[in-house]
Amino acid sequence: PFNSRHKGWVRSANNWGQVCHGGLTAGALAVLEDEPELAAQTVHNTLRNVTRSMAVYAPRGSYPEGPAYWSYGTSYNVMLIGVLESVLGTDYGLSMAPGFSMTGQYPALAGGPSDLFFNYADGGSSRNPSPILFWFASRFNRFDWLRGERQRLSELLATTEASRGASNLDRFLPLALLWMKTGPGKPECALPLHWQSGGETPIALHRSSWDDPAATFVGFKAGSPSANHGQMDIGSFVLDANGVRWAVDLGAEGYHGIESRGMNLWNRAQNSDRWTIFRQ
C-alpha cells in the first residue's frame, strides 16, 4: 500500500496518517513471526511518516480538526504506541513528540460546563467517553484529565444495557479496561481557567470555574478555513452559562447532501465550491 497510486495517506499531515499507520502497524506486528520482512517494512514506513500527523499537537496539545477528530486520530496513535511498546519494547520516541504529552488535557479544556464540546471544525458537540483518556491519565499521572469521564462511561454502559446492546459503542471501548488505573478519588484540578493553544489553528478557552455547573465558558477559534476539516467559521465562538449553551457552532454537515448537488468539496482552488459552503 505504500507504493500504490492511492498512497496519499502515507505522508498525510492529518488524521489519515494516524489511522492508517496505526492500523497497518497493529496488523503487521500481529503477523510478525510469519511475515517478518513485511512487518519490518510497515514499521519503518510508519516511524518515518506518522510524525507528520503528530506535528499538529505542538505546541500545547490542541488538535486542529476539533475534539471529535481528536478522539478518532489520537485513538489510533495511542494504539500505535501501545503495540510498538508491547511487541518491540519501545515506541521509538513517538510519545515524546512536541505537544503529545499535553494532549490528554485537550478534551477537558474543550468541554464546557454544559458537558458539550466546543465543536469547531467538522464535528459534533456531544461528549462520549474516550478510552484513550485513561491511557493519558496513567501515562502522565494526570488523573484530573479524567474529569467526568467515569460518569460518562457509566451512563453509556447503562444506556447500552437498557437497549440490549444496540448502542453505537466505540470500537476502542474495551481497551479502557487495560488502561484504567486506580487514581485519587477526586484529584485536585490542575487545569487552567484560561488557556490558548497556539499553533496554526489556535483556539482560546476561558471559564469562570471548574467546579460550578453554572459557570461561564467561552471558546474562540482562529486559523484558516483551508485546514483539515476546517469550516468557514474562523472567528466563531461558543458560550455556556447557567448550564446552557447559548451560542453554538453549527457543527458538521453530511458530505453526501452537498456532493449530490454537484458541488466539489475537495477542490481547494481559489474559486472552488468549498469556499462557498459555511460548514465545510
Predicted regions and their residues:
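Aromatic-lined, polymer-binding surfaces characteristic
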Residues: 1-116, 123-124
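Catalytic and substrate-binding regions of extracellular carbohydrate-active enzymes
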Residues: 156-280
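Extended glycan-interaction surfaces of carbohydrate-active proteins
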Residues: 1-7, 30-56, 132-168, 198-203, ...
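Generic structural hydrophobic/aromatic packing signal, biased to beta-strands
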Residues: 24, 46, 53, 107, ...
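C-terminal, helix-dominated tail/subdomain
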Residues: 91-171
